[in-house]
Curated annotation (Swiss-Prot):
UniProt-recorded name of the protein: Ras-related protein Rab-40C
Membrane disposition: Lipid-anchor
Underlying gene: RAB40C
Keywords: Cell membrane, Cytoplasm, Golgi apparatus, GTP-binding, Hydrolase, Lipoprotein, Magnesium, Membrane, Metal-binding, Nucleotide-binding, Palmitate, Prenylation, Ubl conjugation pathway
Involved pathway(s): Protein modification; protein ubiquitination
Organism: Homo sapiens (Human)
Amino acid sequence: MGSQGSPVKSYDYLLKFLLVGDSDVGKGEILESLQDGAAESPYAYSNGIDYKTTTILLDGRRVKLELWDTSGQGRFCTIFRSYSRGAQGILLVYDITNRWSFDGIDRWIKEIDEHAPGVPRILVGNRLHLAFKRQVPTEQARAYAEKNCMTFFEVSPLCNFNVIESFTELSRIVLMRHGMEKIWRPNRVFSLQDLCCRAIVSCTPVHLIDKLPLPVTIKSHLKSFSMANGMNAVMMHGRSYSLASGAGGGGSKGNSLKRSKSIRPPQSPPQNCSRSNCKIS
């Protein structure tokens, strides 16, 4: 956990996360999609290890993440046991187009329970842009996550969908577990950055943030701020985040979305992806 004291630091908290799962589930794709991340490993040896850092904004606080991806091959289980020491959060990653990778999550949970017991974890279904090849139903994965007390996300690095949001949610879980609510005083004076973020996300649905004429890093911060503060709740379904959940909102949530759109100038229909070569079925 990072400290708050030193003014030379460019972050308020430092967290170490592990991405675990079978090989070829796209963990490297998730890391590569973090455009503001640094890829240099602080250690001389990196065989079988991918490392990247990125900084997210969580309720106005800068959280630096050290992200470690150990190869999913069996011979790297020893490496996982070594790197699990000091880990504060774990992302269990599977490929929604590969049933075998989902069935293998049980084995990874056993490894985690043995070598990193009590560490917060979330379940991540990767490659949502290949939903037309889906072998793992969303509802089955969500039920599995709830059974194992995990938050569930379906993500697409290619479409920049839910990647930052998944890291933000895991960061919030970790920091809350370490008593973050005692550090963050509810009557603190909001910074200009906080006020600007609140002003923008209060009148912009989260799925339209990508259409704003802003740099990618700022748009990522806005989406993280929105998710961290429970704003734009029409994009949420329980504690799960996926394309399927976006279609389920109704009642007062649907009305709030209509009110948000009514005060904005006419816009073209929202697109699911920010990249032209991506299509989610």
